[in-house]
């Protein structure tokens, strides 16, 4: 990873100042959503419009990431490029979630994601996407689930299972349990 783009809305100026005061060896650019929150899909779309890259790794900041995820991430990246797919989501079995209130977003069969009434896998907040999956977007404000649902309908939504403990800062209750 040579370039990092951070999409911001809340506390954008503070985040930008913090990054500018660090001595990171990466090219880091902070992109602001401006007047309106763009939601998850719109935020990623905002980054894509401000970039020339074809493929993007996105990480949600409300997951506690650590070096234990590195091998999983490298394996997921290898699968993505080897199979020339246009998306892949890192998921974890719901029993590995620190927050036992999180029930599941998807099912995983091989590396294909699906949904039904008994979803057992939680989206971790990490995905690799190709800009082409945003070609049909005609609105700047939308949830990433809009894209996922279209891919699910075509049976083209891919997943990769992490076996790490999943810690999502769902709310203040979870934050307090971690302290």
Q: Where would I find each of the regions flagged by the language model?
A:
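Proline-centered loop/turn at the N-terminus of a beta-strand
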Residues: 29, 55, 86, 156-158
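Conserved N-terminal catalytic core of the sugar/cofactor nucleotidyltransferase
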Residues: 1-60, 64, 71, 136-139, ...
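Structural beta-sheet core signal
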Residues: 6, 58, 87-90, 159
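Catalytic-core segments of class I nucleotidyltransferases/pyrophosphorylases
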Residues: 57, 64, 69-81, 94-98, ...
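Short, polar loop motifs at secondary-structure junctions
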Residues: 11-12, 92-94
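Conserved beta-strand termini and adjacent loop/short-helix elements that scaffold enzyme active sites
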Residues: 9, 31-34, 90, 116, ...
């Amino acid at each position: 990873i040579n370039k990092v783009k951070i999409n911001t809305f809340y506390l954008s100026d503070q985040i930008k100042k913090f990054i500018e005061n660090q001595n990171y060896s990466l090219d880091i650019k902070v992109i602001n959503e401006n007047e309106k929150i763009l939601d998850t899909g719109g935020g990623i779309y905002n980054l894509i419009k401000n970039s020339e890259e074809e493929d993007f790794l996105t990480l949600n900041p409300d997951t506690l990431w650590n070096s234990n995820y590195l091998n999983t991430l490298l394996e997921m990246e290898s699968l993505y490029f080897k199979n020339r797919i246009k998306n892949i989501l890192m998921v974890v079995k719901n029993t590995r979630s620190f927050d036992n209130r999180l029930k599941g977003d998807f099912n995983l069969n091989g590396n294909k994601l699906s949904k039904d009434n008994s979803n057992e896998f939680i989206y971790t907040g990490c995905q690799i996407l190709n800009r082409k999956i945003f070609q049909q977007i005609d609105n700047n404000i939308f949830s990433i689930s809009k894209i996922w649902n279209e891919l699910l309908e075509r049976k083209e939504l891919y997943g990769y299972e992490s076996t790490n403990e999943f810690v999502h800062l769902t709310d203040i209750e979870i934050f307090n349990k971690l302290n």
